[in-house]
Amino acid sequence: MLIKEYRITLPFTKEEYRLGQKYMTARKTHESSNAGDNVQLLEKSSFTDKNGVKGTFTHKVFLLKKSLPRYASAILPKSALKIEEKSWNSYPNTKTIYSCPFFGEKFYLCIESIHKDGRDEEENVFGLSKDILKKRIVDHVDIARDEVEGKDVKTDEDPRMFKSKLTGRGPLTSPNWRKEVNPAMVVYKLVTVNFNYWGFQNRVENLVQTNGLREVFLKAHRSLFCWMDEWIDLSEEQIEQFEQSTYQLMMNNTIENKLNEDIKNMNISEKKGNQQNTYSKGDFKCPNVNCQHVCSECKHMLMTTTTTTTKTVTETTTTVQSPICYRNMVC
């Protein structure tokens, strides 16, 4: 098991970051979808944690086939190309757990985040035990001075060159900018990764932490800073509208994948006596037992609805399946 605590100083207030992070996450999701990556939203609901703080729970699935080299996606099983994300966001605290069905319990990745105003760092903001503190590695991520891989460098997303027209912040050219900027805040991210495969554990855990997550944190927060003028003046309502368009995009991905899977598994030809009826992608039989006709317009399918039964971060859920129309009509 490898435990790292990433600390990221940013020239924002905690409240500015809350809105900016929403915008950044939504835009990154749009960009990923346009690039061919597939993100599905399975659930979005409210929860209350053990301290009585309310937040939002999301359950997403990332399909990685289009993000991997062709040879890798060709030899890996389907279950290895799917990553599940469960996230509890009760800002300024968040917790996200990632899993992969292919590896089961042998793979565990957890990211806990705390956001604090001010540039002074706290040495044990997560309240870790002495044993965990001995294992923890602290890594400072500098959005201006840390190098990004050459192929991923974008001149319009370089904090050393960007100056905000709306706030006057930037460019971040001073070697000591983290001690000089005002306002300032620190993002703390405690990342725990465990890959329980003998002979591969250390290599994979280091790969996930360094080449994976650290690069993601660095690039995402560079973008957040350089996109400042796009979101800094947006209202809460405008941010929420942008988020809703993202959720709709993910729901469309979920529906499209479910539709394609249903069609793939369906016997698209039926024989009734001497007559053979053949159904195309947009013309197949409704799975609802009460619906006897072939449905070519509404494309009925089985969708999954989830009901929350507890009010903690470790909540359990019950899942009920019901036939729901592709065009949002109950069958």
UniProtKB/Swiss-Prot annotation:
Superkingdom as given in the UniProt entry: Eukaryota
CDD domains in alphabetical order: SRPBCC_PITP
Single annotated GO MF: phosphatidylcholine transporter activity
Keywords, alphabetical: Lipid-binding, Transport
This protein's record includes keyword Transport: yes
Keyword Acetylation: no
Family matches, as InterPro entries: PI_transfer, PI_transfer_N, START-like_dom_sf
One Pfam short name: IP_trans
GO CC field: cytoplasm
Family indicated by similarity: Belongs to the PtdIns transfer protein family. PI transfer class IIA subfamily.
PANTHER family: PHOSPHATIDYLINOSITOL TRANSFER PROTEIN (PTHR10658), PHOSPHATIDYLINOSITOL TRANSFER PROTEIN 4 (PTHR10658:SF38)
Role summary: Catalyzes the transfer of PtdIns and phosphatidylcholine between membranes.
UniProt name for this protein: Phosphatidylinositol transfer protein 4
Organism: Dictyostelium discoideum (Social amoeba)
